[in-house]
Amino acid sequence: MRQVTERNAMRELSRAWRARGERIGLVPTMGNLHRGHLELVERLARRVDRLVVSIFVNPLQFGPGEDYDAYPRTLEADLNALEGRGVDAVFAPNAREMYPGVEPPWTGVDVPALTQTLCGAARPGHFAGVAVVVIKLLNIVEPDVAAFGRKDYQQLQVIRRVVGDLDLSVEIVEVPIVREADGLALSSRNGYMDGEQRRRAPALYATLCEVAAALEAGRRDWSQLEAQACRRLEAAGFDAAEYVAVRRCDDLAEPQGDEPRLVCLGAARLGAARLIDNVEARLKR
């Protein structure tokens, strides 16, 4: 496993693999790796000849007052975690390498139908920054397939839309959420919580499961379900329930009539930790 820090070196390595007819996979991360990231790595390693994991804390997707400076940088531990897992290269550039010689505002990518609601409303500009860095990574590594986790469900749909709309030649693979035994979705930000906050945190998943169960049992009063769920989160000790929302799976639009599948999404804060999660509901026709 080699570590690459320069864009041109990563391009040359990928193109050498491609010239030999090898299939390339990419797992984009911001580091501080946990079992959820390693699941992405292991799933993709079985499908490709060469696997690249990128580790880059992308400044473009952090807004003013967010945790860019505080976000954990654990490169040595991450490299150790990736050893022996079928990873051929770790692409770990710094911000100057990824965004050389330019000052903001950078070129943006706008997906208005998917980015102005839910987490996009709470974090203006976040998904534009995600889209830019993902496109850059895809252009640098030139993978045949890239893996993203379902936990960041809105991000996953934004990336799928960008790849489709811009005719990018890459397959996007969705990997299921990895959870703790009590249901909490694994996240690099879970470490922000103290012991009491960590004990409260599984209520987000439990609440979304209740919403999904109500939908599967026949309830269709979306707004009332969402409001009840937010009240439950606040009663469970969350500092703020940013949203609980029932949406169509593909475009995150509000449901219209009968839908075979819906996704229940939520975001809530416990101290410095902003937790997100989602649960799918399969509806009876």
UniProtKB/Swiss-Prot annotation:
(R)-pantoate binds at Q61, Q155. It is found in: Cytoplasm. Pathway: Cofactor biosynthesis; (R)-pantothenate biosynthesis; (R)-pantothenate from (R)-pantoate and beta-alanine: step 1/1. The active site is at H37. ATP binds at residues 30-37, 149-152, 178, 186-189. Homodimer. The keyword Protein transport does not apply. One of its GO terms (molecular function) is ATP binding. The reaction proceeds by a bi uni uni bi ping pong mechanism. It catalyses: (R)-pantoate + beta-alanine + ATP = (R)-pantothenate + AMP + diphosphate + H(+). Belongs to the pantothenate synthetase family. This is Pantothenate synthetase. GO terms for cellular component: cytosol. The gene is panC. Beta-alanine binds at Q61. Its EC number is 6.3.2.1. It holds the Pfam family Pantoate_ligase. InterPro entries: Cyt_trans-like, Pantoate_ligase, Pantoate_ligase_C, Rossmann-like_a/b/a_fold. One of its GO terms (biological process) is pantothenate biosynthetic process. CDD domains: PanC. It is an enzyme of class 6 (ligase). Catalyzes the condensation of pantoate with beta-alanine in an ATP-dependent reaction via a pantoyl-adenylate intermediate. Gene3D superfamilies: HUPs, Pantoate-beta-alanine ligase, C-terminal domain. The lineage of its organism: Bacteria, Pseudomonadati, Pseudomonadota, Gammaproteobacteria, Chromatiales. Keywords: ATP-binding, Cytoplasm, Ligase, Nucleotide-binding, Pantothenate biosynthesis.
